[in-house]
């Protein structure tokens, strides 16, 4: 049907959701993607829930007017506080959120120490509390990392500045974490810096691949998969040439 050629919209507080977009494109290269990053208001993770809901609502309103066929909320903070509102407002629409990949982490390490590094809003949210309750584990450490998003937004994901930032955040956990859940879509871009601090023995988990698989499943069930040609369009509230250059770079970069 004609609607199957409409865009899959992917939204984030900035460029972090590109880590999810990469997984979507890898899994469904023939689809058409519209990525919107709200870098002018980043980070969401240090704002109030009310602010995040308002900004997410405004973004989705604009995108719905474009005739999109599905919405991927590729922002852990926006998913944590706004996904319920979006699903109530658009009950018949395909809306996929992202959540920290806690389930695979606790399944892999049922008796070992697992960390969840995320924004303060995500760590405080009821959605994460429910996720932890659904995946009981004897030793989960919550690790807030306010400031990490800003470094990724500045193009410093793999830099001495990122190392200096992460050292006090993750330093106390060196040799103590078997698994670390990356609870913000910006964080996978800092994988190299995280490994420099924690080493290679700590297994990193992020929810991008699972989100892409769920999106494919929902589109397939609805008969909305597209057979190409695929494309990716970037839009950003900052509307600055440097941010679009960063988007293209993050799409291509090997950050592992």
Where are these regions (language model features)?
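Non-catalytic structural scaffold of enzyme domains
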Residues: 1-256
């Amino acid at each position: 049907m004609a609607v199957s050629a409409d865009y899959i919209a992917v939204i984030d507080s900035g460029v972090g959701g590109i880590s999810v977009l990469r997984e979507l494109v890898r899994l469904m290269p023939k689809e058409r993607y519209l990525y919107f990053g709200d870098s002018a208001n980043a980070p969401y993770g240090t704002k109030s829930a009310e602010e995040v809901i308002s900004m997410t609502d405004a973004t989705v309103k604009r995108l719905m007017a474009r005739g999109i066929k599905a919405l991927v909320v590729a922002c852990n903070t926006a998913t944590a506080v706004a996904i319920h509102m979006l699903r109530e407002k658009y009950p018949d629409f395909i809306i996929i959120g992202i959540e920290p990949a806690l389930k695979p982490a606790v399944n892999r390490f049922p008796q070992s120490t697992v960390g969840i590094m995320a924004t303060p809003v995500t760590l405080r949210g009821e959605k994460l509390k429910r996720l932890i309750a659904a995946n009981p584990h004897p030793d989960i450490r919550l690790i807030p990392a306010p400031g990490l998003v800003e470094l990724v937004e500045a193009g410093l994901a793999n830099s001495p500045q990122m190392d200096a930032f992460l050292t006090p955040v993750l330093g106390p956990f060196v040799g103590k974490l078997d698994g670390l859940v990356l609870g913000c879509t910006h964080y996978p871009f800092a994988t190299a810096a995280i490994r420099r601090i924690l080493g290679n023995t700590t297994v990193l988990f992020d929810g991008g691949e699972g989100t892409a698989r769920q999106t494919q499943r929902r589109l397939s069930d609805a008969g909305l998969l597209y057979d190409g040609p695929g494309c990716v369009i970037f839009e950003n509230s900052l509307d600055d040439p440097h941010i679009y250059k960063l988007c293209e770079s993050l799409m291509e970069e090997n950050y592992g």
